[in-house]
Every structure is written in structure tokens, then in C-alpha cells.
From Swiss-Prot:
It comes from Mus musculus. GO terms for biological process: positive regulation of DNA-templated transcription; transcription by RNA polymerase II. Keywords: Activator, DNA-binding, Metal-binding, Nucleus, Phosphoprotein, Transcription, Transcription regulation, Zinc, Zinc-finger. Belongs to the FAM170 family. The N-terminus is necessary for nuclear localization. The C-terminus is necessary for transcriptional activity. This is Protein FAM170A. Its main location: nucleus. Residues 170-179 have a biased composition (Polar residues). The modification Phosphoserine is found at S308. GO terms for molecular function: DNA binding; zinc ion binding. GO terms for cellular component: nucleus.
Length: 333
């Protein structure tokens, strides 16, 4: 009896262990339940299938790439057996290739849109001036006293596309634009002190190179004055270069010319609206005057009476005159 009980106990334990092992095998092999096996990405793959579908803008681009990707999309909605699996080479390499080709194209599209927004024409506002003793006067005047009385004539020129170079001045500080090699503050003082200690007649001081004067400080007879910083430039090209690459000098007149163009554009739009309103008022006035003239004439016609209704002492109708003549003739005869 004891041996039988032991055998039954052992058989029950063996059956339990067999059931646990079967459940583990079912979990480790999902092909028997119809769930497709998850494929780990290879070494050369760029991204997984989820990243691939997030990058592609439309599913039509996915279909014509390869037959393996079409099979993958077609069979993903249906449970498949281990025999119907798509080969790993087709199912894994095609999404990675498409992901690597679609993501950079998306980035290039966005950058091209930003460049198109930045690359716009721009108006530069300047004034042609003459220089007399280092003072800029108006172009048309001969004396400085007359230039103060006359209003300066401002002109404009349009820069070609691609005006702005680099980042806008609001996002860039002047200190960051300066070179790191340039000494600042105390370093300049320490460098200048040993040079100043040398006697004035020494050859070291004589051989020291002099700084080149900038072009805008050179005396000139006439030029073009920037309306933002009032600097005079010899040629129109130098003025355009100043507005275009002014950030290199530590400041820029770019914002001034943009706001000036906006203000002038708004003023022109307001003036055109006022002119249109005045034109409509002028066209409506003669119509109203004609209508007023027609109204009293109609009233006068209504107020007139025929000859028969008028009193005889004032007006005589032609019929009454004939009757009187006939009556006089009959009485005379």
C-alpha cells in the first residue's frame, strides 16, 4: 500500500512538472499560437520598424520599395504560421534603407523652407551728400546754410536676395563675435606698459606699424550716407556691404532699414486708402447735386395749373379771347 501511494504521489508531481514545462515552451515559441516572431535588428540597421513608420510621410513610398516590405504590410494584419514567415533579409533590410533615405530628405526640406524665408530682398535708405571740411552737406546745395533750410532728400536701393549673412543681431552678443586672441582690459594695459617705458627716440618705437585708417574715415568729396548710422561711404557697393555684413563690425543697421521699410509701407498704404476715399466722395457729390436739381423741377411742374383754372382777371386763355371777340362782333352788328 505504501509503495502504491508513493507511485501515485510521484506520478502527480511528474504530471505537474510536465505541465509547467509545456507552458514555458509555449511562451518561448510563439509561432504555434499564430503570433509572428519578433526579429531583433541587425548590426547594420539604422532604425527599428517603429522609427521607420514615424519617418515616412505616406505609406505609398513604402509599397514600391521592395516586395518584402509589401509582404510585411500585407501579412501584419493576419496571423501567420512559421512556414509563412518572410525571410529575415527582406523584412529587416528594406525598412532600414527606407528610414535612412527618408529622414535626411525631410530635414533638407525644412532647412530649404527656412532659407527661402530668410532670403528676401531688402531696401536700403541713404542720402547723397557732399563733404566740406569733414562735414556732410546735402547733394544739391552749395552752402551749409541752405542745407539746413532745405529738407534732405532720402533715396532707397534694393539689395538682392540672400541679404542676411549669419545669425540675427538679437541672438548674437558683441563679445562672442570678437576673436579670442584679441586682448581685453588688463591684458592690453600690461602689454602697453613695457612699450611705453622705452625712450621716444628708440628704434623699437619707430619701427612699430601704424594701424590702417578705415575707408569710411578717409576724406572724400561726395558719397552715400547711411540713414541709420550717418556714416558716409564712397561707393554704393560699400554701403550695401556695410548693411549686409555689419555684424562683423560689432553692430548692424539691418534692423533700422527693415523697420524703415515697414513704416514707409504702412504710410503708403494709408495714403492710398485716403486717396480712394476722396475719389469716392468726389464721384458721389455730383450725383447728389443732380438729384437735388431734379427734385425742385418736378415740384414746379406739379404746381403749374392749366389756363382754364387760372382767374380771368389775371390770365385769359385763347378760347376766352375768341369768345369775347365773337360776342363783340355780334353786338356791333
Amino acid at each position: 500500500m505504501k509503495r502504491r501511494q508513493k507511485r501515485k504521489h510521484l506520478e502527480i508531481e511528474e504530471s505537474k512538472e510536465a505541465g509547467i514545462s509545456k507552458s514555458q515552451e509555449d511562451i518561448s515559441h510563439p509561432e504555434s499560437t499564430g503570433v509572428p516572431k519578433a526579429q531583433s535588428p541587425g548590426v547594420g540597421e539604422v532604425s527599428s520598424a517603429s522609427e521607420y513608420f514615424s519617418c515616412v510621410s505616406s505609406p505609398q513610398k513604402l509599397i514600391h520599395r521592395s516586395k518584402g516590405t509589401w509582404k510585411l504590410l500585407q501579412d501584419s494584419s493576419k496571423p501567420r504560421s512559421p512556414l509563412d514567415q518572410v525571410p529575415e533579409g527582406e523584412a529587416t533590410t528594406a525598412p532600414s534603407q527606407q528610414a535612412s533615405s527618408s529622414c535626411p530628405s525631410y530635414k533638407t526640406c525644412v532647412s530649404s523652407l527656412c532659407m527661402n524665408k530668410e532670403e528676401r530682398g531688402m531696401k536700403i535708405y541713404y542720402m547723397q551728400v557732399q563733404m566740406k571740411k569733414g562735414v556732410a552737406i546735402s547733394w544739391d546745395t552749395k552752402e551749409t546754410s541752405e542745407s539746413l533750410e532745405k529738407q534732405p532728400r532720402m533715396e532707397e536701393a534694393t539689395l538682392p536676395e540672400g541679404v542676411w549673412v549669419g545669425t540675427p543681431p538679437s541672438d548674437v552678443s558683441t563679445r562672442n563675435l570678437l576673436s579670442d586672441s584679441e586682448p581685453i582690459g588688463e591684458e592690453k594695459e600690461h602689454e602697453e606698459k613695457p612699450e611705453s617705458d622705452s625712450p621716444p627716440g628708440s628704434p623699437a618705437v619707430e619701427e612699430r606699424p601704424r594701424a590702417k585708417t578705415p575707408d569710411w574715415l578717409v576724406t572724400m568729396e561726395n558719397g552715400f550716407r547711411c540713414m541709420a548710422c550717418c556714416r558716409v561711404f564712397a561707393t554704393m557697393e560699400s554701403l550695401q556691404e556695410h548693411v549686409q555684413y555689419g555684424i562683423r563690425e560689432g553692430f548692424s543697421c539691418h534692423v533700422f532699414h527693415l523697420t524703415m521699410a515697414q513704416l514707409i509701407g504702412s504710410m503708403e498704404s494709408e495714403s492710398t486708402q485716403e486717396e480712394e476715399e476722396d475719389h469716392t466722395e468726389e464721384t458721389e457729390k455730383p450725383k447728389e447735386e443732380k438729384a437735388e436739381e431734379q427734385q425742385p423741377t418736378e415740384e414746379d411742374v406739379g404746381m403749374k395749373k392749366p389756363w382754364s383754372q387760372c382767374p380771368g382777371c389775371v390770365f385769359d386763355s385763347p378760347k376766352d379771347r375768341r369768345r369775347r371777340k365773337d360776342h363783340c362782333d355780334n353786338s356791333g352788328s
